[in-house]
Amino acid sequence: MRKMKRFVRCRVLVSALAVISALAMASCEEHVEIYDSSIKVGNILLSDNTVISPYGYDRDSHMAVGVIFYTNEDTVLVVGTKELGSHIYTDSIGTVSNVTNDVVSLCGAENTAAILSSGFHSPAVEAVKAFCSPVSGWVLPSAGELKALSRNLAVVSVSMKAIGGDAFTNWQYLSSSQDGSSTDSEKMYYYSVSLVNGFITSVLKTTEGCVRPVIRIR
């Protein structure tokens, strides 16, 4: 009987220790999440160019400018907090030189620079350049960048809501990429992307699409 009592007490003690250990681990993991400043999808870029986890974000003491939506060894992309309305690619038809015209390249910065240096007037690019933010360097995303955002939209949307940013729409988003499938299509069309499903559409350059700015921080 005494052996049985010792055995029961031992099992109770082991169970209690297991519960305490589990609670301690959970508390530790929560602490790590709150102070996670790593470069990863879903973390938040602040106005002082630092990064914070959405779990540690405080609207009273932090100023968010965007959410990380893509990372690899040499590239980190952030999407801005604001929708910039619907705009057209250009107000006239023609090929913009030095724009990368495919659906995979992460080249919004280069494409935006090419559009700005061309003779074409782009209301979409103008909207991005007029975007008011404490961080500079926002661009019109390429089709490849919008596709990358689409792939991580669920995670990004949770963080965007946490910081009070605009929700993403269900409409097609205008990219800085022309339709490169032929010489004629480059003149006439740009690629638009649905963030909901990643679907890409070739759209006449004088047709409006939603504009959301992005920035490359590495």
List the predicted regions and their residue ranges.
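Compositionally biased, low-complexity segments enriched in small residues
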Residues: 1, 16, 107-108, 165
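Bacterial N-terminal signal peptides that target proteins for export
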Residues: 2-15
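Processing junctions and N-termini across compartments
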Residues: 19-22, 207
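C-terminal motif of bacterial Sec signal peptides marking the signal peptidase cleavage site
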Residues: 23-27
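Short, compositionally biased
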Residues: 28-134, 205-218
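An exposed tryptophan-centered "aromatic clamp" motif
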Residues: 121-138, 143-195, 199-201
